[in-house]
Amino acid sequence: MIAPVRWLSRKDVALVNLPFASALNIIEVTLRDHGNGAFENPPKIGIHPRHDALIHAMPGWLPTQRRAGLKWIATYSSNRSVGLPSITGLLVLNDPDTGLPVCVMDAAYLTAVRTAAASAVTSKYLSPSHVRKIAVIGAGIQGLYHVEMLSLVHPAAEFHIVDIDDDAVRLLAQMVRSKARIVPVKEAEIAIRTADVVVTATSQLEEVAFQFSWVKEGSLVLPVHPRGWSEDITTASEVLLADDVAQFASYIMALGSPYRDISRVLGSVSDVITGQVTGRANDSDRIAVFNLGIAVHDVAIGSAIFDIAEQLGLGTIVSY
């Protein structure tokens, strides 16, 4: 055996039980590293075995944190119809000094957590001064974790949840650990028009489902996926940002440019955090932020899970 590798199954990752507050802090620290240029995060590359599916490779390196790894993640929306999860994947963590793998873990949980944490940190820095209502469109796992994470940043906010499946909304309300107040809403437009923060956490959409004209003055819009909004989201918003500008441009071009002038992207959320870009100038600004997911977030969250798993003796040691 050259070196031991710790295998963490989906059950093992769940047993680690990484606190949401810890995940939020990890993502904020990692965004600061990103803003200071202490990272390598090549735009994700992918293959598309089906027209409604993708498999992406996402490598990331955080020199300050001394963390390196790669996530191999698949999104198959049609899996739900046959009782399989729509998002599956693995994260491989490497020793940055030798390159040897040290851990392989299920990546579904950490993907959901880091995505919601990125939205919550974004909201911390870019929301209007008073957040009373948050619209979450989509009551799946992303919707659930967005409620959990955003309630840490906005504990007094009311969450208006929309989903085509009423049972999904009821299940979300039952599963939420925080004291967030959940209000079921039938129509996305109704929820969006009164919300101070809007999260669209549906499955991948091919057609326009949300009009930016519904967004009220001063709101922050957080799409989890690149499609689904009217093409003017990139031109009608007063401020347009992404989690990683190069990756956002690459992704949008690969999708056939569903939005208008993406050159209006001022920078990244991390640029706002480090003071290189002005985010919200006043409470009337409508701000759109495309957090499409960056590998350094996966590596940072996965590393925290790995550290706790080692301390608790979780997982299976395999030879390499």
Swiss-Prot record:
A GO term, aspect molecular function: oxidoreductase activity
GO cellular component: cytoplasm
Coiled coil: none
EC category: oxidoreductase
Domain of life from the UniProt record: Bacteria
Keywords for the protein's UniProt record, in alphabetical order: NAD, Oxidoreductase, Plasmid
Effects seen without this gene: Cells lacking this gene show an impaired nodulation efficiency as compared to that of the wild-type strain GR4.
Enzyme Commission number(s) from the entry: 1.-.-.-
InterPro entries: NAD(P)-bd_dom_sf (IPR036291), ODC_Mu_crystall (IPR003462), ODC_N (IPR023401)
Family matches, as Pfam families: OCD_Mu_crystall
Matching PANTHER family: KETIMINE REDUCTASE MU-CRYSTALLIN
Function: Seems to be involved in the nodulation efficiency of R.meliloti GR4 on alfalfa roots.
Family under the similarity heading: Belongs to the ornithine cyclodeaminase/mu-crystallin family.
Protein name: Nodulation efficiency protein NfeD
